[in-house]
Amino acid sequence: MAAGALDDFQHAAALVLRTPTLIWIFLGGAMVTFAVNGLIAWGVSFMRRIHGFSVEDIGSNFGIWALAGGVLGALFGGRAADWLQQRWPGGRVFAAGAGFVLGGPVCVALIMVDDLRWFAPLVMATYFLYTWYNGPLAAVILDVVPPAVQASVLGAFVLFSHLAGDALAPPLIGYLSDRTGSLRTAMLLLPAVGVLGGAVILIALRTVGRDMSRVHA
């Protein structure tokens, strides 16, 4: 069974390297995963150290608003992606990448804001935009690979995005915080990488139509 799983992974990796859309999705997906999960990992420490929030404050000002924004963003992103896809082969790619390009400035505002009246709305807006990608990105992967290997390629994407993305974010932000003496400054890396990742995903707009046609030919 282990040998079969390894063979499946190797086949999935070879398919990724032969499919331009998947290359952009894998690279961009790792970057946006870095941004999202870095924000989650350091959010509590940020609010306690920068704003002096208590545990109760964090629950009401971060958890609830982030959850609400994330749920609404995932639903909106999926619906918008499907609506666009009916009119344009790049619809799902656009929805997956656009949320991070639009969300980058909002996340910067969240990190830099001192007026706490804006904090909860910015948390919700950031997570709303940062969760558009969840459904569309997986759907793009399924759109450009044969049905026989869809699960293997999707599994390879999840593995790659975690190893190259969110596994790196917490220690790197911690290191930069120690080096700069400012957690706020260190966390500005997250929206920067998120915008870059969104832009990399959007490069797949140039290739997704051709890759979809090849699968369905």
What are these regions (language model features)?
Residues 54, 91-94, 175-194:
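A membrane-interface helix-boundary motif in multi-pass transporters
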Residues 104-113, 188-217:
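Multi-pass alpha-helical transporter architecture, strongest
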Residues 74, 142-180:
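A late C-terminal transmembrane helix in Major Facilitator Superfamily
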Residues 1-11, 212-217:
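Flexible cytoplasmic inter-helical loops of multi-pass small-molecule transporters
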